[in-house]
Amino acid sequence: MAKKIVAVIKLALQAGKANPAPPVGPALGQHGVNIMAFCKEYNARTQDKAGFVIPVEISVFEDRSFTFITKTPPASVLITKAAGIEKGAGESSKGSVGNISKSQLEEIAKTKLPDLNCTSIESAMKVIEGTARNMGVSITE
């Protein structure tokens, strides 16, 4: 029989830099999960993606064991890296803070496709384009 899931914890952590300090320790500790085991496993899985924030979804079972799924980095992080900017515009209507090309947009859409609620690259590109526009990043040909 399958184990019963007690809790699902969602965190966004730096790739390869999870440690027992907050926010990881308290979030996992209250469910009785072995914090160091999670940190070691997460760091091992994400060490090749250094510099990105990687969202993780941790399923905690009755017997205090756990499994986790790593997601793709947030679109905003991928867009800021591609545009070479520190952060998006405070007010996107006031003007552009940077720009990315269509090919960069397609690359980001391909990366994000498994986590987006769409099936084609074209629709994924539209979703990412909307995110970029809201951040004050313009799309160039």
Swiss-Prot record:
Gene (UniProt): rplK
Record GO biological process: translation
Signal peptide extent: none
Cited Gene3D superfamilies: Ribosomal protein L11, C-terminal domain, Ribosomal protein L11/L12, N-terminal domain
Posttranslational modification: One or more lysine residues are methylated.
Sequence similarity: Belongs to the universal ribosomal protein uL11 family.
SUPFAM superfamilies: Ribosomal L11/L12e N-terminal domain (SSF54747), Ribosomal protein L11, C-terminal domain (SSF46906)
Organism: Prochlorococcus marinus subsp. pastoris (strain CCMP1986 / NIES-2087 / MED4)
Keywords associated with the record: Methylation, Ribonucleoprotein, Ribosomal protein, RNA-binding, rRNA-binding
GO cellular component entries: cytosolic large ribosomal subunit
InterPro entries registered for this protein in UniProt: Ribosomal_uL11 (IPR000911), Ribosomal_uL11_bac-typ (IPR006519), Ribosomal_uL11_C (IPR020783), Ribosomal_uL11_C_sf (IPR036769), Ribosomal_uL11_CS (IPR020785), Ribosomal_uL11_N (IPR020784), Ribosomal_uL11_N_sf (IPR036796)
Superkingdom assignment: Bacteria
Coiled coil start-end: none
Pfam families noted in UniProt: Ribosomal_L11, Ribosomal_L11_N
Subunit structure: Part of the ribosomal stalk of the 50S ribosomal subunit. Interacts with L10 and the large rRNA to form the base of the stalk. L10 forms an elongated spine to which L12 dimers bind in a sequential fashion forming a multimeric L10(L12)X complex.
Function, in words: Forms part of the ribosomal stalk which helps the ribosome interact with GTP-bound translation factors.
Disulfide feature: none
One Gene Ontology term of the molecular function aspect: large ribosomal subunit rRNA binding
PANTHER family recorded: 60S RIBOSOMAL PROTEIN L12, LARGE RIBOSOMAL SUBUNIT PROTEIN UL11M
Name of the molecule in the record: Large ribosomal subunit protein uL11
